C-alpha cells in the first residue's frame, strides 16, 4: 500500500512539472537580451497593466496551460512587462504598444519587433501567434508588407486573416 501511495505521489509530481505554464523571466531588458542571444531565441514580451481584465484572463487561463508553456518556454525568452511602471513605460513606447494585452516578439540582436499581436486569445490562437513569430512568412512585419503591396494570393489572405483576428481587428479579418 505504501508503494502504491508513493508511486501515485510521484505520478502527480511528474504531471505537475509536465504541465507547467510559461516561465516568465524576472530580469531587466538588458539581461533578457543577453539571455536570448546566449540561448539563440527571440524574446516574447507580454505587455500588460494592473487594471487590464483581458491581461488577467491571459495570465490565469492561457499562460498557465502546459501546452502553451511547453511551446513558449522551448522557443522564446519570455518576459511580462507592466507598461505603466519602470522600464516598461519606455519599452511600451519603443514598440508602440497602444492596447493591452499586447504581445511583442523581438529579435534580440536588432531589438526590432518581428511580430506583434494582442487581445484576449484562446489557446489555439495564442499558439498560432507564437508559431507565426517563428515563421518569416507569417510574422506581422511580413504580412503587413505583403498587404500594403496588394498581395491577393489565397494562402496569404488566409494568413493575414488569422493575423488580423489575433490583433482583434475584426474589420481587417473579415475582408
What spans do the regions from the language model cover?
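Short active-site neighborhood of thiol/selenol oxidoreductases, capturing the structured segment around
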Residues: 39-50
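Non-globular targeting/processing and membrane-anchoring segments
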Residues: 136-175
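Non-catalytic, surface beta->alpha helical segment in thiol-disulfide oxidoreductase systems
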Residues: 98-139
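Thiol-based oxidoreductase modules, predominantly thioredoxin-like and allied folds used
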Residues: 22-27, 47, 58-88, 97, ...
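N-terminal leader/targeting and pre-domain segments
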Residues: 19-39
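Bacterial Sec-dependent N-terminal signal peptides
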Residues: 1-21
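Serine-hydrolase catalytic core recognition
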Residues: 34, 42, 76-79, 101
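Hydrophobic heptad-repeat coiled-coil signature
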Residues: 52-55
Amino acid at each position: 500500500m505504501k508503494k502504491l501511495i508513493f508511486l501515485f505521489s510521484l505520478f502527480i509530481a511528474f504531471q505537475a512539472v509536465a504541465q507547467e505554464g510559461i516561465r516568465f523571466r524576472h530580469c531587466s531588458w538588458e539581461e533578457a537580451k543577453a539571455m536570448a542571444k546566449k540561448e539563440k531565441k527571440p524574446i516574447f514580451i507580454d505587455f500588460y497593466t494592473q487594471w487590464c481584465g483581458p491581461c488577467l484572463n491571459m495570465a490565469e487561463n492561457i499562460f498557465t496551460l502546459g501546452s502553451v508553456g511547453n511551446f513558449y518556454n522551448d522557443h522564446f525568452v519570455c518576459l511580462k512587462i507592466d507598461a505603466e511602471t519602470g522600464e516598461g513605460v519606455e519599452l511600451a513606447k519603443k514598440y508602440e504598444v497602444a492596447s493591452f494585452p499586447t504581445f511583442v516578439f523581438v529579435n534580440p540582436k536588432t531589438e526590432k519587433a518581428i511580430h506583434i499581436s494582442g487581445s484576449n486569445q484562446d489557446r489555439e490562437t495564442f499558439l498560432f501567434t507564437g508559431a507565426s513569430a517563428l515563421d518569416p512568412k507569417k510574422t506581422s512585419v511580413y504580412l503587413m508588407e505583403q498587404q500594403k503591396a496588394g498581395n491577393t494570393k489565397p494562402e496569404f489572405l488566409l494568413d493575414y486573416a488569422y493575423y488580423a483576428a489575433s490583433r482583434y481587428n475584426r474589420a481587417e479579418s473579415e475582408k
